[in-house]
Amino acid sequence: MAKQIYDSMAMKRALTRMTYEIIEKNKGIDDLVLVGIKTRGVYLAQRIADRLKQLENAEVPVGQLDITLYRDDRHDASLAQDPVVNEADLGFDIKDKHVILVDDVLFTGRTIRAALDALMDIGRPKKINLAVLVDRGHRELPIRADFVGKNIPTAMDEQVAVYVDEVDGKDGIELKKL
């Protein structure tokens, strides 16, 4: 049984608030680039970029990162398939840029650590911040998000499901028992 945490409108409000926080913390959007972690992080990054364009009247580049090659927890049942090795599709240089890494859910921190490794293999950004729609706790590594849409404390037998219209045909966040 799933419990709805956010509907489409609440999710839109959270992303808008995160966008304002990004602008405020960075005193504008100079040298800012967004990098979404596949799959849902890419769509969330694009939505933040669209909102930045509306608010600041400037384009912010959006790239995507597939970190499956870098994961150190392949023994996990959810990654039982052979990993797909894809190049990072940034389309821009991250050297001396302020990178906002975007993902849907922050859990153990392992995906983010892997994404940081991948980014550092690509180039040397001036700064990296982390934006996540949901922080569910249970960190295994010392990683913290700078911009959070919603903190959702969870039990280990629960799962946070983020839905984006581009992939799932709807927007929303649900909490499910495993």
UniProtKB/Swiss-Prot annotation:
Motif segment (PRPP-binding): 99-111
Catalysed reactions, as listed in the record: UMP + diphosphate = 5-phospho-alpha-D-ribose 1-diphosphate + uracil
Key words of the record: Glycosyltransferase, RNA-binding, Transcription, Transcription regulation, Transcription termination, Transferase
Complex and partners: Homodimer and homohexamer; in equilibrium.
Pfam families: Pribosyltran (PF00156)
EC top class, as a word: transferase
Family affiliation: Belongs to the purine/pyrimidine phosphoribosyltransferase family. PyrR subfamily.
The protein's name in its UniProt record: Bifunctional protein PyrR
Disulphide linkage map: none
TM annotation in the entry: none
PANTHER family: BIFUNCTIONAL PROTEIN PYRR
NCBIfam families, sorted: PRK05205.1-1 (NF003545), PRK05205.1-4 (NF003548), PRK05205.1-5 (NF003549)
One annotated GO molecular function: RNA binding
GO biological process: DNA-templated transcription termination
Function per UniProt: Regulates transcriptional attenuation of the pyrimidine nucleotide (pyr) operon by binding in a uridine-dependent manner to specific sites on pyr mRNA. This disrupts an antiterminator hairpin in the RNA and favors formation of a downstream transcription terminator, leading to a reduced expression of downstream genes. Also displays a weak uracil phosphoribosyltransferase activity which is not physiologically significant.
CDD domains found in the cross-reference section: PRTases_typeI
Matching InterPro entries: PRibTrfase_dom (IPR000836), PRTase-like (IPR029057), PyrR (IPR023050), PyrR_bifunctional (IPR050137)
EC identifiers of the protein: 2.4.2.9
